[in-house]
From Swiss-Prot:
Localisation per UniProt entry: Mitochondrion inner membrane
Its job: Component of the ubiquinol-cytochrome c reductase complex (complex III or cytochrome b-c1 complex) that is part of the mitochondrial respiratory chain. The b-c1 complex mediates electron transfer from ubiquinol to cytochrome c. Contributes to the generation of a proton gradient across the mitochondrial membrane that is then used for ATP synthesis.
GO molecular function, one term: metal ion binding
Residue sites binding heme b b562 per the record: H83, H182
Superkingdom of origin: Eukaryota
Main location: mitochondrion
Name listed for the protein in its UniProt record: Cytochrome b
Note: Heme 1 (or BL or b562) is low-potential and absorbs at about 562 nm, and heme 2 (or BH or b566) is high-potential and absorbs at about 566 nm.
Keyword Transmembrane assigned: yes
Residues bound to heme b b566: H97, H196
Binding sites annotated in the UniProt record for a ubiquinone: H201
Length: 379
């Protein structure tokens, strides 16, 4: 078998990626989330495939087909809730993965980091289109509000919105194309994940110290396969507890009402994993400004390699930057909370302050903290 995995063309690829891959000896549990994201992607593709076998992308029957899956299909309720809550699990792992990348300076691997940001955009687009498919109240109004934001673009905005809708409002054409795109996107994401891993394996993994670890690297198997397997068991235990005991905890009750274009819900909001960006969008009184702030809330991550001023890569030995990092995490949590609240005082002001703080920490305070820490090293 040893000869086979080192000589066979296909086995060689697997061997270099998952068995004999030289890995730093000191990477912590925060590095588990890459493999957990792979697990989430596989889970979403398989559950989505089985759901697509029974779903109909028609405005008259979409809601009924989801009900049919839950009531009449063998274990359909389980497949549906695995898929719906699997999206939440995916984003939880994704945000922790990005947070770890920021904390330990992994963004300095620029190709890997930028492909990761592209993956985040595609995953967000896929999740948004998936949320529209059950054709409940929040699905319909969420699709209407979010796609309508593109009309803020000068000159081409309204034409672009109508092109996406396939008509003059969100209707059958919109639902059909969203279903087609939602089905194909995970396979595009999978291809990009391969490229993400390719670039990562060119440089090797980062480690908590942010120092080169070439002299002490260990093979990925059995050390990190065992460690990743432990992470998988823990995560699946928590995930199955959520799916089997609290399947609707993260959903919106309005989505159990069929879509009605004549009745607007009192408070239109996306799923919890988009609320931080939604809060930033709402905090700008101008429509175009809000859309630009929404896009920049993710695009700002591409600037991190250029804003890195410290002589140290990781935040492990940088108390000032650590404080700012945890302030940023607290701010994102506050924005998530604000995004779920109605547009009224005091939530409007809190959202605006939190939005300004979000961009200030990333663009101003963290680069300044890096320069101050460089000065402190010379004392």
């Amino acid at each position: 078998m040893t000869i086979m995995r080192k000589s066979h063309p296909l086995m060689k690829i697997v061997n270099h990626a998952f068995i004999d891959l030289p890995t730093p000896p000191n990477i912590s549990g925060w590095w588990n989330f890459g493999s957990l994201l792979g697990l989430c992607l596989i889970l979403q593709i398989f559950t989505g495939l089985f759901l697509a076998m029974h779903y109909t992308s028609d405005t008259l029957t979409a809601f009924s087909s989801v009900t049919h899956i839950c009531r009449d299909v063998n274990y359909g309720w389980l497949i549906r809730y695995l898929h719906a809550n699997g999206a939440s699990l995916f984003f939880m792992c994704l945000y922790i993965h990005i947070g770890r990348g920021i904390y330990y300076g992994s963004y300095l691997y620029m190709e890997t980091w930028n492909i990761g940001i592209l993956l985040l955009f595609l995953t967000m687009a896929t999740a948004f289109m998936g949320y529209v498919l059950p054709w409940g109240q929040m699905s319909f109004w969420g699709a209407t509000v979010i796609t309508n934001l593109l009309s803020a673009m000068p000159y081409i905005g309204q034409d672009l919105v109508e092109w996406i809708w396939g008509g003059f409002s969100v209707d059958k054409a919109t639902l059909t194309r969203f279903f087609a795109l939602h089905f194909i996107m995970p396979f595009i994401i999978t291809a990009l994940v391969m490229v993400h891993l390719l670039f990562l394996h060119e440089t090797g993994s980062n480690n908590p110290l942010g120092l080169p670890s070439d002299c002490g690297k260990v093979p990925f198997h059995p050390y990190y396969t065992t460690k990743d397997f432990m992470g998988v068991i823990l995560l699946l235990t928590l995930f199955m507890t959520l799916v089997l005991f609290f399947p609707d905890k993260l959903g919106d009750p309005d989505n159990y009402t069929p879509a009605n274009p004549l009745n607007t819900p009192p408070h239109i909001k996306p799923e919890w994993y988009f609320l931080f960006a939604y809060a930033i969008l709402r905090s700008i009184p101008n429509k175009l400004g809000g859309v630009m702030a929404l896009a920049f809330s993710i695009l700002v991550l591409t600037l991190l390699p250029y804003l890195h001023t410290s002589k140290q890569r990781s935040l492990s030995f940088r108390p000032l930057s650590q404080t700012l990092f945890w302030m940023l995490i607290s701010d994102v949590i506050a924005l998530t909370w604000i995004g779920g609240q109605p547009v009224e005082s005091p939530y409007i002001v809190i959202g605006q302050v939190a939005s300004v703080l979000y961009f200030s920490i990333i663009l101003i305070f963290m680069p300044i903290a890096g320069l101050i820490e460089n000065k402190m090293l010379k004392l």
